[in-house]
């Protein structure tokens, strides 16, 4: 039962982060969650989420990602042709940010680290480079622990 609550909270947070462009959007995004009824049958409240977000934004790197200095692409789809099976695959990084020639890719995670997460971000980075961007960095952000892993 606790595991289910943990997963549900992770889904709520994932959705919440997709609606936050800058730190200034937090209150409106939390209000939207409440209006949409996403917190109605949950133990988590907007106040608890706000406290958690405030703590996460104290991390300098996270604060930078939500600073407003970036052109933001939330949940954007990157298409990839696979010649092996003649199919088009869709990839959807959680947050792609661009500032000048710099591109930063962040994937939010709410569980324990897994090797496939690293490969997932590496794939996003390779696809972004194939679009002509050379200055690309990628990160996994484990939101619950507020741990950031840079992917090389």
Residue ranges of model-derived segments:
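Metal-dependent nuclease catalytic regions and adjoining charged, substrate-binding loops involved
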Residues: 126-152
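Nuclease catalytic cores
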Residues: 1-93, 97-100, 116-119, 137, ...
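Short, surface-exposed beta-strand-loop junctions and turns on beta-sheet-rich folds
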Residues: 111-113
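Short, charged, amphipathic alpha-helix that recurs within catalytic cores of restriction-modification
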Residues: 117-129
